Every structure is written in C-alpha cells, then in structure tokens.
UniProtKB/Swiss-Prot annotation:
PANTHER family reported for this sequence: 3-ISOPROPYLMALATE DEHYDROGENASE
Superkingdom of origin organism: Bacteria
Enzyme class: oxidoreductase
Annotated site location: Important for catalysis: Y145, K195
Name listed for the protein in its UniProt record: 3-isopropylmalate dehydrogenase
Name of the encoding gene: leuB
Summary of subunit composition and partner proteins: Homodimer.
GO BP annotation list: L-leucine biosynthetic process
Keywords attached to this entry: Amino-acid biosynthesis, Branched-chain amino acid biosynthesis, Cytoplasm, Leucine biosynthesis, Magnesium, Manganese, Metal-binding, NAD, Oxidoreductase
Species assigned in the record: Escherichia coli O6:H1 (strain CFT073 / ATCC 700928 / UPEC)
UniProt xrefs under InterPro entries: IsoCit/isopropylmalate_DH_CS, IsoPropMal-DH-like_dom, Isopropylmalate_DH
Higher taxonomy: Bacteria, Pseudomonadati, Pseudomonadota, Gammaproteobacteria, Enterobacterales
Pathways involved: Amino-acid biosynthesis; L-leucine biosynthesis; L-leucine from 3-methyl-2-oxobutanoate: step 3/4
Length: 363
C-alpha cells in the first residue's frame, strides 16, 4: 500500500496564487497516474496573511507546515506592504522565519538551458548551443553571514567594519552529503567551490569535502576556486553538474547560474533540513505588475513541485514525468509571454493545462 503524504500549500502574493493553481493541476495528474496518496492544505503567508491575520506568518501557518511532509511555497511581497517595518514585511517576516524554524540548511537551485530557448541565453551562441544543466547546492545557515564577531567600531580614519567566516565540521559534512547524493541522481559529478589558497575556512572545507568524497566512489569530485568558477560558468557552463558552495559563494554563483538561463520564470528552488523536510519555491519574485493577468510563466512553480516529489517524497519517477512534460511543451514551441518574443503566447492557465495533460499521458 502506498504511503500517505501531506503537502502544505502557501500560495502567497502577486502571481503566487495563479501559478500555484497550475502546479496543483499537475499534482492532480501525478496523483492519478502514479496512484500516489497526496493531500494538501492551504495557508496564508506574506502579504495575504498580513491582510487576513495582521502578520506575515500566522501561527496556524507554521502549525500547518509542521504537520506536513513538505511545503510548496508561492511568492510573497509587493508595494502594498513596503511601508511596514522591515521585520513585518512579507519577505523578511515570513520566508526567513520559516527557514529558521525548520532548520533549512541547504538550498538547491537548478539552472537548465532548455532546448529551443538558447536565444534567451546571454552567452555566445556557440556556448549556448552546448546547453547546460547545473544544480547549485548552497549551504544556508553558516559562513560569513552568521559568523561572530561582526560589527562596526571606531571613528574617523580608524573606523572599521568586520565580518567573520566560520564553518564547523558538521556544517560542511552535511551540505557535502547533500551535494554527493544529488549528484548520484544526476551525472555523478561534484565541483566544490572554495578559496583554499587564501582562506582557512576554505582549507577546512576542502579537507572535509575530500573526506566525504570517499563515501561516494561513484561520484567524480573536482575543486575550483571561486574566482575561476565565475569565469568558467561564462566560458563553458556545460562542464558542470553539481556545484557545492558555501553560503557566500553559493549566493554569488546561484544568481550567475540563474542569469545565464535567460528566464527567471523557469527556475525552481528547494531548501532542505537534515530530515528531508523541504520548502520548495520559484526562484523569482511575486511580480505584482503582472498578477491577475493570466500571463505569468508557471513553469518555475511546477518545477518546484517536481523537486518536492524528488527530495521530500522520494518520488523520482513522478518528478521526472513532470520534467519530461515540460520539455515536450517547450520542444513544441509552447510559450508564455515572457518566452514568446512576438510569437503567439499561451496563458498561465493554458500552460498549466498542457503540462498536466502531458504528465497524464506519460509523454
């Protein structure tokens, strides 16, 4: 008998609700085709929660997420709530506390250049023609963003500011294992990014990654300095499979990977804890300027569902079915407005219907 799963659905603001609707259409197709027992519950978050409950992350939303196997998150924020104090605004008051509450230490950001979308890639045509499919695995809770001491002191010419890069062994070990396990589901290659020619924290990082690599003899490990990595991503992104990064370096490289795909509407994201619980969301924002117009690209939200199935529900077949359906739609020239470039475009609803149908048909 198949296991029962429960997903907490947090549509949020802007285009969040309408692209979430498309992801749930696809989830219905997955349920039917793979006979999976998956239930969902909806909760307010972000600006919608401020409007309805007076706070961006109500206790009922947190409790609902605690009772779920995973969280499918839409997007939060918009000009309507920008006048509020920073810690009460949708982004800082909802998403960051959720990450902290559930101890989400790893961030996974796939960046893929799909066949037929090479013209959107800002790289030279001969480089884009090779395509790329990269997974950036970023450590989220350690490093220079959280290390102590940090601050400012002194005055005049002696005024200074300082931050501290700190990594503990356990932090490096667990993020490295995420990267190696992910590589086993892909092309069996990990490139670990550091600055071990200068930084003590990077020397430790490299040593521990080498140790963890012995547990994965089927995965090829290479090391690369961060400055070289930023260059190699522009020169030949097809050489990479999984990038393993510290918090700071991952912050930089994940955005670079996103940019070279040419469309934020295609990029999902996953944040995981040690138990496999995850929060899955599009990498883009709430796009309030196009909200409610039925023109937003829902693919990032649908791909976020695929990540959820793969990493939190261990349903790789279902995740792959979604990815194949998206590939088929794009190969057939089906585009939302952000990808149409003057050609005929389908609506948000139509794109969701097409992908759901392809999942059901098993393309």
């Amino acid at each position: 008998m198949s296991k029962n799963y429960h997903i907490a659905v947090l549509p949020g603001d802007g285009i969040g609700p309408e692209v979430m609707t498309q992801a749930l259409k696809v989830l219905d197709a997955v349920r039917n085709r793979f006979a999976m027992r998956i239930t969902t519950s909806h909760y307010d978050v972000g600006g919608a929660a401020i409007d309805n409950h007076g706070q961006p992350l109500p206790p009922a939303t947190v409790e609902g997420c605690e009772q779920a196997d995973a969280v499918l998150f839409g997007s939060v924020g918009g000009p309507k709530w920008e006048h509020l104090p920073p810690d009460q605004q949708p982004e800082r008051g909802a998403l960051l506390p959720l990450r902290k509450h559930f101890k989400l230490f790893s961030n996974l950001r796939p960046a893929k250049l799909y066949q037929g979308l090479e013209a959107f890639c800002p790289l030279r045509a001969d480089i884009a023609a090779n395509g790329f499919d990269i997974l950036c695995v970023r450590e989220l809770t350690g490093g220079i963003y959280f290390g102590q001491p940090k601050g400012r002191e002194g005055s005049g010419q002696y005024e200074k500011a300082f931050d501290t890069e700190v990594y503990h062994r356990f932090e490096i070990e667990r993020i490295a294992r995420i990267a190696f396990e992910s590589a086993r589901k892909r092309r069996h290659k990990v490139t670990s990014i550091d600055k071990a020619n200068v930084l003590q924290s990077s020397i430790l990082w490299r040593e521990i990654v080498n140790e963890i690599a012995t547990e994965y003899p089927d995965v090829e490990l290479t090391h690369m300095y961060i400055d070289n990595a930023t260059m190699q991503l522009i020169k030949d992104p097809s050489q990479f499979d999984v990038l393993l990064c510290s918090n700071l370096f991952g912050d930089i490289l994940s955005d670079e990977c996103a940019m070279i795909t040419g469309s934020m509407g295609m990029l999902p994201s996953a944040s995981l804890n040690e138990q496999g619980f995850g929060l899955y969301e599009p990498a883009g924002g709430s796009a309030p300027d196009i909200a409610g117009k039925n023109i937003a690209n829902p693919i990032a939200q649908i791909l976020s569902l695929a990540l959820l199935l793969r990493y939190s529900l261990d349903a790789d077949d279902a995740a792959s079915a979604i990815e194949r359906a998206i590939n088929r739609a794009l190969e057939e020239g089906i585009r939302t407005g952000d990808l149409a470039r003057g050609a005929a475009a389908v609506s948000t609803d139509e794109m969701g219907d097409i992908i759901a149908r392809y999942v059901a048909e098993g393309v």
